[in-house]
């Protein structure tokens, strides 16, 4: 019997997930399908229920349904709990739904693939939305020394800090802080842009001195050409820039492993996906 998986979103036609999971499944000889499902903005729960009732085993969730998916779960992972959102749903044998958030795990996996260990790194995280929130715990668990969160609206960055400094009796209290963009100081090993500004060719209002010839800049956005943020980072002398395509493949791999118990080869699929992206009409 063929196991069914899907990604839910609105819009969803642009999703790379069916291609990625198809490539993950191909070498395993396992029988499964993965489709993109356009759920009505006001009909996600009904669409998901219908999918599971029809034999669906698991699902990915993207914009704008991650928070709704979180509310539907019977159990959630620590990453999902702190993110307040899920991107991966698993229908368990007892009929309950487990929610995971693999976005931050995908980010960390891609950073490690590119840079090696993140131990003792000083990291700047730009943005304080859902994308930022989902990657904080995985970054901290990867052993970074300090995480600075900076956002146009400072109160949102401070809210994230308050959430994470209360975790595990304050275990992260000395490692996470919020700083106004115009007050950023010192050098950073890694700067991560979690905002979607690059999609419209815009940049966060950052001081140029935060980038040195040792700084690696990571934009969660991606495209056929270098993103606006990464272009700016290179112009300021960054040592290396990375876009979010590897994070996309990485989070998908974590989902695939949760469902199938198999760790797929992400680098092969990332190369195929990059080639596919470059070949798409501009």
Swiss-Prot record:
Pfam families: SDH_C, Shikimate_DH, Shikimate_dh_N. It catalyses: shikimate + NADP(+) = 3-dehydroshikimate + NADPH + H(+). GO terms for biological process: amino acid biosynthetic process; aromatic amino acid family biosynthetic process; chorismate biosynthetic process; shikimate metabolic process. GO terms for molecular function: NADP binding; shikimate 3-dehydrogenase (NADP+) activity. The active site is at 66 (proton acceptor). Involved in the biosynthesis of the chorismate, which leads to the biosynthesis of aromatic amino acids. Catalyzes the reversible NADPH linked reduction of 3-dehydroshikimate (DHSA) to yield shikimate (SA). This is Shikimate dehydrogenase (NADP(+)). It comes from Shewanella baltica (strain OS155 / ATCC BAA-1091).
